[in-house]
């Protein structure tokens, strides 16, 4: 039974628990979900303890902008991150007056008529909810602090063989 469980978890589906508010309002603290393991192929990180049995990825499909993806970083092989894919290799990402800009295209953002309160660490914060539409047409909800500061950033170019992710909760 243990071997079957390891095979299922390594190759097919894996359960995850949402520990933080970074993906609110899409995923809430305490949510539990199953993630398919085969969507983007397999790498050494697909297996328990990340043994170096595979170099690179096999049976891989390319992720699409807007996909919610579970991943590990090269610097931290133990922590699973769950974020939304915003930029592909070579894309330019920037925030201008609080608006997300990808490859010089302002990401369309429309206000959802409700006001929300979400958890940020151990405190609750008031947020405005928006629906964003990415350049490929995918839509999702995001939240920003109710009195957000209209942040600006430098242009970031996504390096080759890398991706750019953001949580749907943009200010916490």
Across the structure, where does each feature detected by a protein language model lie?
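Hydrophobic membrane-insertion alpha-helices, especially the h-region
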Residues: 1-11
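Alpha-helical transmembrane signal-anchor/signal-peptide segments
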Residues: 13-31
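Soluble "head" domains of membrane/secretory-pathway proteins
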Residues: 25-172
